[in-house]
Amino acid sequence: MESYAGKQFVGIDLHRRRTVIVRTTEAGEVLEAVRIVNDVQRLASVMARAGQCPEVVLEATYGWYWAVDALQAGGANVHLAHPLGVK
């Protein structure tokens, strides 16, 4: 895991029991890729490393509500993506 002071972009692949989170720089360099058990506190812990107001994209799939609530509570700008519309 690298320290990075600039704006971060985060992609989240949310599944029923686990989630994959990838943090990147503005240039697209991967800072961290982790797989966590779905838990609000664990998500908040990983997202704390993304700095203030990270841009987060999350697939709008079944059960995304809790994650969006937790991300927004932590100051993230959340963007929902349609599963069939993202390439």
What residue spans do the PLM features occupy?
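Phosphate- and other anionic-substrate recognition elements at nucleic-acid/protein interfaces
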Residues: 1-87
